C-alpha cells in the first residue's frame, strides 16, 4: 500500500507496507521525504498540523492508515515550514539554501502594516454544521517564517491594509495554489471587499507551537459518514471530478506556488446585465438548454440559438451563448431543468419580464466564478422592486459586507448568502482567523468513479429471500488489498434470483454488513461463504453503501419564451396539457434505472407506419415490463410516443434508425447517469381519470409549487428545437409525414407547430403493470399494429425471475397478437403462451393442413365439452400422417386394438388426403374441407358403425365390407321402412320450411356449405341413423351442451337439418348412379352369358336381377333357358325405380384411374394371381359340358389357395384383429336359408373361405364388423383394397375376348374380389322372398 502526501504543489509518495501504521508515522515519513524533495537538510523545520483526505475529512493522528485511506489515495498536508523557498529548484542541490531577493521581511520593512493579521489563541477554527453546509472548506495558514516571529502581536486591526497577492508577495499558507479565493465578508469598516479577503494571520509565538494541535473537548474529527457533511461532500466531489489539475510545476520548479496576479478578481455583479422584456404574449424566438458547470451544477439556461426574424433577434435582446441566471424573482442557478422551466412559465404571467443575463463574452469567467461561489449572487439584487436592504445573516454579530451595485445603484446588500457563524464572542469584531478559500481541488485516485469508498452515499438495508435460483448477484473486490482485506462490491445482478426479483440491489453497491456481520477485514472468499451459508427459503439482510450521482441534464433545445394565452395558462393550472388544441400533453420523465443494472428501462417499443404511404410515424411504447424501472416509476404508459430519450430526438428518423438511437442512448447514457430522461407525447384523457400518477392535483397546485423532480410538463414549443419539431422547412417536412391522415393513429389536423402524433385514438385504460413482458431490458420489435384489435392469448401470471405476462383487460384495446410482424422478443425466446394450440394463427394452419382432422377448432371444442368422451385416438390421430401402405395402417390399428376397447362415439372426421394425389383428384374432393362435418350424434347423421354401406362408399368405390351388401337406400326401397321413411319425410318438410326462412340470412354461408356438400357427394354416401329415438335425443343433448349460447345452438340445429335434407337427396341419387355404374362395369367386364357358363346360375340370375337397362331378346331367351334348367319360376323384372342416367359415371371412372396410377407399385406376382371360382356342376347340366375338371385342377386350386394365404397375410391380420358382429337379423336368416337350398360349388366356397375374404363374413348384415370402429380406418383400408381390385379389372379388360364356352377353371382371367362380392350380393325373386345379404 502507498499513498501520496501533497505539500503544496510538491507531492511525496510514501510506501506504507500493509497499511497497519498510524497516521502519525505516515506524517513523519512524509516530512522526511519532503525535505529531500526540496533539498533541505534534516534540521530544516517543518511542522504538519494535520492530514486531510483528498475526498474530504481530517485524519486523526492515532488512526490506523488502512482504516481511513485506501491504496494510492491522495492526502493533503496542512503544514508550516521554516523557510519557504522562493525560487529555488526543489530538485536541484545548487539552489540549496538560496532565497529570492524579494525576501519576506523587506515587504514588512517597507510597509508599516503586515500582510498577516495576528494569530489569537482563541481563533481556532471551529467546525460547525453551518460551516460545512455553506460549502466553505477549511484551510489553515502557514505562518512559520522565522523572519516574522519577532513581530508584535498587538497590532491593531484598524491599521491593517491588505495587498494583492503576487509573485512579490507570495502567500504560502494555501494548501493548493492557483485558485481564486472565496469572496468572504471582511471588516465592517472596510469599503473595498477585494481587500477584505486578503487578510493573513501573523505567525504564532514559537512557545505555543506545541499547543497548536491538541485533542480536547472542543476538537474532534468529523467522520466522513456523518450526515451533516453529506450534501457538502457531494458538491465537493462534483467539483473535483470536473476540475482538471495541472500536475506539472510552474517554472521555475521551486517558484512560489501562487499565480493569482494573472486572474482578475471579479464578481457576478460585474458580469450580469439586466434585460427588460415587455410581455406582449408572443414568443421570444429563443432556444435554451441547461447550462451546467463541469461539476454538474446547473448555472442557468443557455441561449442556444435565436429564431430568424424572432423578437429576440429583432430587438437585440439576447445573443447566442448568453446565460440567463435569473428571471424576475426566480434564481435559475442550482435548479433542475424542469424546475427552471416551471419558474419560466410562472414568470410569463407577469406584464414585464426581467432577465438577468451573463453575456457570452463573460460566460467563461462566470463558469470559473461558479467554482468559487456556490450561490453568492444575491437573489434580489437586480429585482425591479428591490429598493431596501435585505440583510441576511444567521448571527447578530456577523459582519456584513457592503457591496457595490453598479447597475441600478441600489443600496448595498450582503453578498454572501451562505450562513456563517462567529468563532467567539470577543472575536466577533475581528476578521475571521482564516478566510475561506475554494475547496482544494485535489484529484482523487479514481475521479468520477462510483466505487470510491470515501465518497459518502446512501445506506440501504436490503433483505433478500433465497430461493431455488439463489440470491442472484455476484461480488467482487479490488485488486490491491488494504491491510489484507478489500471492500466488497456487487459486481452484477444475475438475470435470475432473489436480487432481480427484489429489484433494490444494484451493481456497484458496496457491501458493509451481511446478516449483521461487519465485512471489514474479511476477504472475498469469506464473504462468499457467509452468503452461501444462508439456508434455502431463508432471508439474508444486506447493508450496502450506494454512491448517489447528481443528474447531469443533457443538452436539449427548448423555447421557454413561447407565450401562453390566458386560456392555456388556466388549463395548465387545471392539470391540462399546454398545447393549444388540448388533445395531447408533453411529459418529461426522469426515470431512475432499476436497481439491477441489467433490467434497464423495462419497456417494449413498437414502430408505427402509415397505412396509406407506409411512412414511419414514430416510436411508441408497446408494453411495460412488470418489475422494470418504468413499471416501478409508474408514469410511463402504453401508447406513449417517445419524442426524445436522454436528449436525443427520435423524430424525423426512420423507425429502424430511431430504434438504434433509443438502444444506444439507454445503454450508454442511462447506465452512466443511473437515470433515463424521456420526453413523451400522450393523448389527454377526456375525463382526466388517467392523470399521471406523479402529477399533483389541480386545486392543490399553487403558483409557486414546483413540479415533481422527475416529471415536467412542457409545451410542444419548448421542444421545438428538437429535430423534427424545429420551426424550419425540415421540421415541417417531418411533421407533414407524421401528421398525414392515417387510420392507424388518427390525429386532429392542426398547425404543425403544436402537433405531435399520438399512436391511438382510444384511451389507454390499462395500468402500466398490465402489459406484455419480456426478459430483456428495453427490447424492441418494429411491429405494425393492425386496425382490428384481437384478444390476447391468455397467459398465466408467472413469478419467474424476469417478470410475468399479463393479458390485456379489454380485448378492444388490445392489439392483435397474430398481427403482421408482431412478435416480441420474449415470445421469440421463451414462447410464453399458455396453450399455443388455442391461438388463432395455429388453428388456421391446422385447418388448412392436408393431413389434419377437419376444422380442429370445432372438433376440439365439442370433444372437450362432451361428457365422458373417450380420449383414445383412432384412425388418423394414431399418428399416421400418410397411410400410403397397408402395413402402416395395419400396425397402427393392431396396436390400438391390443391396447383396449375402441371408443364408440366419435365425431365424423374428414378423410386424410395424405397419399399422392394429382390436382384433378384433389379438385374433385377439396370442397369438402371448407367446413367441418356434422357430428355423428347430430340430427341422426349416419355413422359408419350403423350403416356401413352408406358411409363407407367414396368416389373411388372402396373395396370393403360394404361392397358385399346391397345399398341401404335400395334395401329401404325394396323392404319398406315406414318408421325411417316417416322421419325422413318430416325432416324434408321441416328443411323445406327452414330453407325459405333462412335463405337471406345464410346467403353467404351457403356458398361454403354447397361446396362442401358437392365434394362430399363424390366422396361419401350418407344415410339416416339406425339408432332409435332415444339415442337421437341423447345426441341432441350432447351437442347442445357443447355450445354456450342458445342462439348458437338454434343456428347449428337449423343448419344441420338443412344439410341433412340436402345430403339425403344427394345420397339417393348417388346411390342409384353408383349401383348402376357398378353393375354396368361388371356386365361389360365379364358378360352375363360368359358367367353363365362357368360362374353358376345364381351369378347370372343376380346379373339380370340387378341390371337396370332393358334386356335384349337374346338375353331374355337365355334367361328363360336358365330358369327352365333349374325348374324355378321366373319372377317379373325389377322395377325401374333404380334407373338413373349415369351422369357422373365417366367422371368417377376417370378419377379412379388417375388415382390408381399413383399406386401401381405393387408386386408383379400380386397382379398375376388368379382365383378359382369353380363350382360343382349339377347333374342336370347339359352333356356338352367339358371334362376339364380333373385331379390336376384340384392340385392347382390348392396351390393357388396357399399362395393367396401367404400373399394376403397383412389383410388377414388387419381384419382378424377387428371385432366381429355376432348378432343376426332377418337378412342373415334369409341368406342362410338361401345357402342351404342352393349350396355353391367347391370353388366358390373355397373362395369365400379364403382368408382374403374372411372379413366379409362379419359385416354381411349391414353392420360394421367391429362396433365402434373408426370410419376413417375402414375407408383407408377400403381404398387400398379397391385399388388392387381395379388394377386387376383393368388387366382383365386388356385380355382379348375368347370365343366359345370356357371351362370352369380359367388361367387367363384372374378373378377379382368384386366377383365374389357380386356373387354374394345377387338377389333373386325366388319364392317371392326378398334377398338379403
Swiss-Prot record:
Organism lineage: Eukaryota, Metazoa, Chordata, Craniata, Vertebrata
Protein task: Adapter protein involved in asymmetrical cell division and cell polarization processes. Seems to play a central role in the formation of epithelial tight junctions. Targets the phosphatase PTEN to cell junctions. Association with PARD6B may prevent the interaction of PARD3 with F11R/JAM1, thereby preventing tight junction assembly. The PARD6-PARD3 complex links GTP-bound Rho small GTPases to atypical protein kinase C proteins. Required for establishment of neuronal polarity and normal axon formation in cultured hippocampal neurons. Involved in Schwann cell peripheral myelination.
Region called Interaction with FRMD4A, residue ranges: 931-1333
Biased composition (Low complexity): 1176-1199
In-chain residues carrying the UniProt-annotated modification N6-acetyllysine: 831, 848, 881, 1327
Protein name listed in UniProt: Partitioning defective 3 homolog
Interaction with PRKCI and PRKCZ as annotated region, ranges: 712-932, 712-936
Gene name in the database record: Pard3
Stored SUPFAM superfamilies: PDZ domain-like (SSF50156)
Mutagenesis or variant effect for residue 848 to A: Inhibits Schwann cell peripheral myelination
